[in-house]
């Protein structure tokens, strides 16, 4: 019985230590990004990308974690005003937490505030230059604004980081075709 308690205690301490360091600065990300680049197929790549997202979503700040969870739930429920209030508080409370900026960027995009979304994506990328989700979002915004060359660049950067990023290849193909047709 004592041995079982020690094992449970060890697992709890290890999990707490992993969570305490989790965010875009987590050392596990370097290994995961290397594994993502070497993934053999989309299934393996998707699994690794999911682990990266899990780490990006972690924060050691309990209040920040609560605001993030509430903001995501409100955004998913299309209560955008409430989500914006929570994400605004979150980026003030945790200004170096990349996923806080990325989630607010996503919300601002959904609210048609493209300039605000781009600003938050830029901040996300300052904090985590490998954020393939933010790069993909930037590509979508640039496509919507008719900035095809900038969109193409963003999608290519995202795909370099995550070769299995859903939709990026199709967007690249469409943008390259559109740019070729313009050149004619």
Across the structure, where does each feature detected by a protein language model lie?
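Register position in tetratricopeptide repeats
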Residues: 76, 110-111, 144-145, 174-181
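Residue-level signature of tetratricopeptide-repeat
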Residues: 70, 104-105, 138, 145, ...
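N-terminal leader/linker segments that initiate helical-solenoid repeat arrays
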Residues: 2, 18-69
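Alpha-helical adaptor scaffolds
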Residues: 64-133
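Bacterial N-terminal signal peptides
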Residues: 8-15
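Terminal, low-structured helical/coil segments at or just beyond the last alpha-helical repeat
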Residues: 27, 38, 47, 54-58, ...
